[in-house]
Amino acid sequence: MGTDSRAAGALLARASTLHLQTGNLLNWGRLRKKCPSTHSEELRDCIQKTLNEWSSQISPDLVREFPDVLECTMSHAVEKINPDEREEMKVSAKLFIVGSNSSSSTRNAVDMACSVLGVAQLDSVIMASPPIEDGVNLSLEHLQPYWEELENLVQSKKIVAIGTSDLDKTQLEQLYQWAQVKPNSNQVNLASCCVMPPDLTAFAKQFDIQLLTHNDPKELLSEASFQEALQESIPDIEAQEWVPLWLLRYSVIVKSRGIIKSKGYILQAKRKGS
């Protein structure tokens, strides 16, 4: 086992929190898998390669410090937005709550995305449906704590517009009627319905909600898949001690040309019992 893995394992054994950021995937060059078959495969590949890169650059000073929060970054790929170009860019994000039942994860994710990209505000954040137990139908009560936090972030000007994902007409209507800050978009997975449901289309049109399509799996990142990626990258670790709390995927698009300038992932994980 390499020294890199031992040092990384020692740090992870003492830390309570892991922040992982891939930087701009467009800057990865040959490191990036050319044709990942799924979003889940791309994500897992990104997690492993970011962990490997971080492990290989651990300094003796860091090992002596044993920080409580580990910043695991693909350092050469980090790219902040030039303030002079900010008005020309649209910064969008999709937030996936994984192993957290705390709505504060929403604020943490948005704050971290703003910091990583060097911006004061995100133009749009779509919230993937929070995890619920098998056999339980998603209800307004499941969405409310996360949506309230998104509303707070809109009111404090950290986000311009907020949207939902995979809500049917009834769920979207309930959220719309209850919410102070209304959803301006709802993503629909075309793998589950080849044609937009007419009742959803009619409701969205009536209330000026944009219907978008996506092809994310129901579970983009599971606790098990994260732990497997962690174990493979850093064998000298008790990977089952670590739980991913949330994952944020962002993209930066040049408005006038519609091209992607930057895209990447940010993730927060916590060690159990810490």
Swiss-Prot record:
The modification Phosphoserine is found at residue 59. Belongs to the aldo/keto reductase family. Glutamate--cysteine ligase light chain subfamily. One of its GO terms (biological process) is cysteine metabolic process. It holds the Pfam family Aldo_ket_red. GO terms for cellular component: glutamate-cysteine ligase complex. InterPro entries: Gclm (IPR032963), NADP_OxRdtase_dom (IPR023210), NADP_OxRdtase_dom_sf (IPR036812). One of its GO terms (molecular function) is protein-containing complex binding. The modification N6-acetyllysine is found at residue 263. Heterodimer of a catalytic heavy chain and a regulatory light chain. Most abundant in kidney. Also found in liver and testis. Pathway: Sulfur metabolism; glutathione biosynthesis; glutathione from L-cysteine and L-glutamate: step 1/2. The keyword Phosphoprotein applies. The lineage of its organism: Eukaryota, Metazoa, Chordata, Craniata, Vertebrata. This is Glutamate--cysteine ligase regulatory subunit. It comes from Rattus norvegicus (Rat). Keywords: Acetylation, Glutathione biosynthesis, Phosphoprotein. PANTHER family: GLUTAMATE CYSTEINE LIGASE REGULATORY SUBUNIT (PTHR13295), GLUTAMATE--CYSTEINE LIGASE REGULATORY SUBUNIT (PTHR13295:SF4). It comes from the Eukaryota.
